[in-house]
């Protein structure tokens, strides 16, 4: 029985074991799942629910679901099995999910059974199903405004659909909570309204006379009705009625010389009052006609400037100063410009005929240089005469020249705003050629310089240093040839016919041969600096250096010039035009218009400035008009250069040195320095509220002088006894001019400080042999910039030492002279300050006179020594309270002598006549008084001061 039960049990176990090994089917799950998980939660709600089925059920292990596996990169979820028998499962988040980080998650899931036994052998897996999990948002974020403060401006009297828009954003991820549903104005009683999009408009017309600035608070709500944590502030400014105009410019613009280019309108902008424009044109005009001749140019004289610019010499002045040698300009009206240059006025009925011989330097014979190579240079101020209009020509110069081949002729005329040059190479055979230029400078009634270079067949006209090519060149066969006779006329021209009878409206002028010339085409305007030079022509660089304007309008920002912008500057740089179609681009371009003055020492003063604007609008009916802008540039006073002359102010030399062939140098160690004082503002201390100024001296590297003068302090030089010497060869080599008179010596011409130092150190003072001169004072002064800046007055005192042993004397006389010389010889440190005697009489070279002088000198010495000693003793006795019986009257020299050592050397000349000695003594006493008075007058500080103040002006 027992065996039977055991057998049955084993059979059943074998049957069960045989059944578990039959895991024939894989688990099954849905193909796709949709899941939802709430933000900040971890449970996922799936649709359909997560169940896995296995056809091996109800077998143990093979029919059970042991778990789920998730596949995907970085899946923040996990799957758990709730019931192995039913295959129910659950998906949950490993940690709370964030919707703002990721709204949706997609991954795959797979189920697996328990296999064929507890060890999980022969496990089978289901297919992979796709799971989509959406994270549901929670309204955790409040709206946030993009700006904390919003500003806008409105014009009074208008209703705006939108003044400005405020904007808030929400950090939530869902459309429900991330969208702003509406805005609200929290401040009550404001004339503004805000819509759901944040647009603010005014509900009534605002007035500038009322509230000028409105401030109110705005908040925002999302669609979950959550309010913004921080509200926004809004400021709306009310402006007066808009007037189209230029804004942000200064009427006064200060320019410091040497500042380079200075922007005139750095902050300017065009207010169009919202009127759309399609074209803008602005003209900036700088008025410089009142500065010298039309604009600021180099301040040097014409002669100095020609040397600085390297211009060739040999020009002939055709309109010189009226004088005995230049009487042809005597009948013209003469004026002077601000730079003291000579100006001639031609009134339309006057002309001058320049003589071909004599001072003009033109000669009456053949003039080869004027045939086809010459430069004509002049200043002209001309406008269209109302009575003449633009119909009649006006002749500037008319010239017929005789050369080897015959006669040539040229004339320069103006006709309205045209200037024409007619050239006839050869009257006998060639035909005339006419060159025409149309220039606004010809008729603008302003000063301009013209230089015409003729190198036939090439003709170039320079106006203010800028070259212009002819606009038209043509042959003119209708012109009748002029009479074949040399003649040069300025201000008019003669007709071609030779007739002694005057015609109506024509004047006659006699020629050199006595035949009259019928004159017509008179010039009406101003001329100055009219010169001609034959042969070598002036180069473009030289002409530009001589006559170009050094100030004007400037524009250099072409790289950032916007699209469609145009910039035009006239040749004289006094007019600049801008044209464009975009307001912002136009503003940017106008902000870079600048004023420039390249002169280191610019002419100070005011330059008026005008900005004129013309605009074109899309709507002609409502097109705006921009008013004119007027201002001025103030060129400040430049830092004046300080020219300092220094050196030895006193020296003494023996007379033999002055009588040498080269004399004695007056300024052997002269030093000339030039510096500029700059006023700079130092950084003020925190405890000091004022401004601290400091003066800094900075030496300039390059400086020129244009003249120096050596003059006499006191009487003029006596040409028979003294003279000033200077090396003429050295001056001529450097192109300097010398004027040497008995009152002064001047050096004129532009040169560097080093050259002037070298030349002035060579200036020497020479005396004739035997001239009894003892002292002289010389005054030296220099200047630059045509005398605009002057140096200090450097005074040198020269003492001439005369020796008494220049002729033979007895030994006892010589010893007396030596004693006298020792008695009056000053110590070495006072050698340059010895008193000068103004004794002008010649010394009598006789032994008797020498003896008389020695005696008189000895007597004077004794008197002086006695007076000094008595005065000293009187002071000592008075100070110590001497005996009552002692007399202290200093007027009595014979009262007493002290017992100090006194050595007296007497010259025993008692055998000589006492009468002569007495006479000589009286004469010597008178002479001493005169010398004393003259010496005091010469060395009086008030006298020197008076002479310095009354010193004559520069003569160079």
Swiss-Prot record:
The annotated consequence of gene deletion is: Mice are defective in both excitatory and inhibitory synapse development. Mice also show reduced body mass and increased energy expenditure. Mice also display reduced marrow volume and cortical bone mass without alteration of trabecular bone microarchitecture. Conditional deletion in neurons leads to a significant reduction in number of excitatory synaptic inputs. Conditional deletion in the cerebellum causes major impairments in motor learning due to a large decrease in inhibitory synapse, associated with a robust increase in excitatory parallel-fiber synapses in Purkinje cells.
- The UniProt entry lists the main location of this chain as membrane
Keyword terms: Calcium, Cell adhesion, Cell membrane, Cell projection, Endoplasmic reticulum, Glycoprotein, Golgi apparatus, Lipid droplet, Membrane, Postsynaptic cell membrane, Repeat, Signal, Synapse, Transmembrane, Transmembrane helix, Ubl conjugation
Q: Which residues form the Cadherin domain?
A: 29-145, 146-246
Which superkingdom, per the lineage?
Eukaryota
Tissue specificity annotation: Restricted to the brain (at protein level). In the cerebral cortex, found in the somas and neuropil of all layers. Expressed at highest levels in neurons of cortical layer 5 and, at lower levels, in neurons of the upper layers. Highly expressed in Purkinje cells. Also found in a few scattered interneurons throughout the granule cell layer and occasionally in neurons in the molecular layer (at protein level). In all layers, high levels in a subpopulation of presumptive GABAergic neurons (based on morphology).
Identify the SMART domains for this entry: CA
Q: Where is the composition biased (Acidic residues)?
A: 927-937
* Protein family (similarity comment): Belongs to the calsyntenin family.
Q: How does it assemble?
A: Interacts (via cadherin domains) with both alpha and beta isoforms of neurexins (NRXN1, NRXN2 and NRXN3). Directly interacts with APBA2. Forms a tripartite complex with APBA2 and APP. Interacts with low affinity with KLC1. Interacts with SLC23A2/SVCT2.
What UniProt notes about the protein's domains is:
The cytoplasmic domain binds synaptic Ca(2+).
- Which stretches face the Cytoplasmic side? 869-956
- What protein name is recorded for this chain? Calsyntenin-3
PROSITE patterns (alphabetical)? CADHERIN_2 (PS50268)
- Provide the leader sequence positions: 1-19
Report whether Iron-sulfur shows up as a keyword of the record.
no
Residues in compartment: Extracellular: 20-847
Q: What does this protein do?
A: Postsynaptic adhesion molecule that binds to presynaptic neurexins to mediate both excitatory and inhibitory synapse formation. Promotes synapse development by acting as a cell adhesion molecule at the postsynaptic membrane, which associates with both neurexin-alpha and neurexin-beta proteins at the presynaptic membrane. Regulates the balance between excitatory and inhibitory synapses by inhibiting formation of excitatory parallel-fiber synapses and promoting formation of inhibitory synapses in the same neuron.
Single GO cellular component term: postsynaptic membrane
């Amino acid at each position: 029985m027992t065996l039977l039960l055991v057998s049955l049990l084993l059979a059943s176990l074998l049957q069960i074991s045989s059944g578990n090994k039959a895991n024939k089917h894989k688990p099954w799950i849905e193909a796709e799942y949709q899941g939802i998980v709430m933000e900040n939660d971890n449970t996922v709600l799936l649709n359909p629910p997560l169940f896995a089925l296995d056809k091996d059920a109800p077998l143990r292990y093979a029919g059970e679901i042991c778990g789920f596996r998730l596949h995907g990169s970085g899946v923040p979820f996990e799957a758990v099995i709730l019931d192995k028998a039913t295959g129910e499962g659950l998906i949950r988040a490993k940690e709370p999910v964030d919707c703002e980080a990721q709204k949706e998650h997609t991954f795959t899931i797979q189920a697996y059974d328990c296999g064929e036994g507890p060890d999980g052998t022969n496990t089978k897996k289901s297919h992979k199903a796709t799971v989509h999990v959406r994270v549901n948002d929670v309204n955790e974020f409040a709206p946030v405004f993009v700006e904390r403060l919003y500003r806008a401006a409105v014009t009074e009297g208008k209703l705006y659909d939108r003044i400005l828009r405020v904007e808030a954003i929400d950090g939530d991820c869902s459309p429900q909570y991330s969208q702003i549903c509406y805005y609200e104005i929290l401040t009550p009683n404001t004339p503004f309204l805000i819509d759901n999009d944040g647009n603010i408009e005014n509900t009534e017309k605002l007035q500038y006379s009322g509230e000028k600035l409105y401030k109110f608070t705005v908040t925002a709500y999302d669609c979950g009705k959550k309010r913004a944590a921080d509200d926004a502030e809004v400021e709306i400014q009310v402006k007066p009625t808009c007037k189209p105009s230029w804004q942000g410019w200064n009427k006064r613009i200060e320019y410091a010389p040497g500042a380079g280019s200075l922007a005139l309108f750095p902050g300017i902008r065009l207010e169009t009052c919202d009127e759309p424009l399609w074209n803008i044109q602005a003209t900036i005009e700088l008025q410089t006609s009142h500065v010298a001749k039309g604009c600021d140019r180099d301040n040097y004289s014409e002669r100095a400037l020609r040397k600085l610019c390297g211009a060739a010499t040999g020009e002939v002045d055709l309109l010189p100063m009226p004088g005995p040698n230049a009487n042809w300009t005597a009948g013209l009206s003469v004026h002077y410009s601000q730079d003291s240059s000579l100006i001639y006025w031609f009134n339309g009925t006057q002309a001058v005929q320049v003589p071909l011989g004599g001072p003009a330097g033109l000669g009456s014979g053949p003039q080869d240089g004027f045939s086809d190579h010459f430069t004509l240079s002049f200043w002209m101020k001309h406008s269209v005469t109302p009575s003449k209009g633009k119909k009649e020509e006006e002749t500037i110069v008319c010239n017929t020249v005789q050369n080897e081949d015959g006669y040539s002729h040229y004339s320069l005329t103006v006709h309205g705003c045209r200037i024409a040059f007619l050239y006839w190479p050869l009257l006998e055979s060639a035909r005339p050629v006419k060159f025409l230029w149309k220039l606004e400078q010809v008729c603008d009634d302003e000063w301009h310089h013209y230089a015409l270079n003729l190198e036939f067949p090439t003709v170039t006209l320079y106006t203010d240093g800028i070259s212009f090519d002819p606009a038209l060149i043509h042959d003119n066969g209708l012109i009748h040839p002029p009479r074949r006779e040399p003649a040069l006329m300025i201000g008019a021209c003669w007709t071609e016919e030779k007739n002694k009878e005057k015609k109506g409206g024509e004047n006659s002028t006699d020629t050199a041969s006595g035949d009259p010339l019928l004159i017509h085409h008179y010039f009406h305007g101003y001329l100055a600096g009219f010169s001609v030079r034959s042969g070598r022509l002036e180069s473009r660089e030289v002409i530009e250096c001589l006559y170009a304007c050094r100030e004007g309008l400037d524009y250099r920002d072409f790289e950032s010039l916007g699209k469609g912008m145009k910039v035009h500057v006239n040749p004289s740089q006094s007019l600049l035009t801008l044209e464009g179609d975009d307001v912002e681009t136009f503003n940017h371009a106008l902000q870079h218009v600048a004023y420039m003055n390249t002169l280191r020492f610019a002419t100070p003063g005011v330059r008026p400035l005008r900005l004129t604007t013309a605009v074109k609008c899309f709507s002609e009916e409502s097109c705006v008009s921009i008013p004119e802008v007027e201002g001025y540039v103030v060129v400040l006073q430049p830092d004046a250069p300080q020219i300092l002359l220094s050196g030895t102010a006193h020296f003494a030399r023996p007379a033999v040195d002055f009588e040498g062939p080269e004399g004695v140098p007056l300024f052997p160690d002269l030093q000339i320095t030039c510096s500029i004082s700059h006023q700079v503002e130092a950084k003020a201390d925190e405890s000091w509220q004022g401004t601290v100024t400091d003066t800094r001296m900075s030496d300039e590297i390059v400086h020129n002088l244009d003249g120096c003068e050596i003059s006499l302090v006191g009487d003029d030089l006596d040409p028979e006894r003294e003279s000033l010497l200077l090396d003429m060869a050295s001056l001529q080599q450097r192109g300097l001019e010398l004027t040497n008179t008995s009152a002064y010596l001047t050096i004129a011409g532009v040169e560097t400080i080093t050259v002037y130092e070298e030349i002035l150190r060579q200036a020497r003072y020479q005396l004739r042999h035997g001239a009894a001169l003892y002292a002289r004072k010389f005054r030296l002064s220099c200047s630059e910039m045509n005398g605009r800046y002057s140096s200090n007055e450097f005074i040198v005192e020269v003492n001439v030492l005369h020796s008494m042993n220049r002729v033979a004397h007895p030994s006892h006389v010589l010893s007396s002279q030596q004693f006298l010389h020792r008695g009056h010889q000053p110590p070495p440190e006072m050698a340059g300050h010895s008193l000068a005697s103004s004794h002008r009489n010649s010394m009598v070279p006789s032994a008797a006179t020498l003896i008389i002088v020695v005696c008189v000198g000895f007597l004077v010495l004794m008197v002086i020594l006695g007076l000094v000693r008595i005065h000293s003793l009187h002071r000592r006795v008075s100070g110590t309270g001497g005996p009552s019986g002692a007399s202290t009257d200093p007027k009595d020299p014979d009262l007493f002598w002290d017992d100090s050592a006194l050595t007296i050397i007497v010259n025993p000349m008692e055998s000589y006549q006492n009468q002569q000695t007495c006479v000589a003594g009286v004469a010597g006493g008178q002479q001493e008084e005169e010398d004393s008075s003259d010496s005091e007058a010469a060395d009086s500080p008030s006298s020197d001061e008076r002479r310095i103040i009354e010193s004559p002006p520069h003569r160079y």
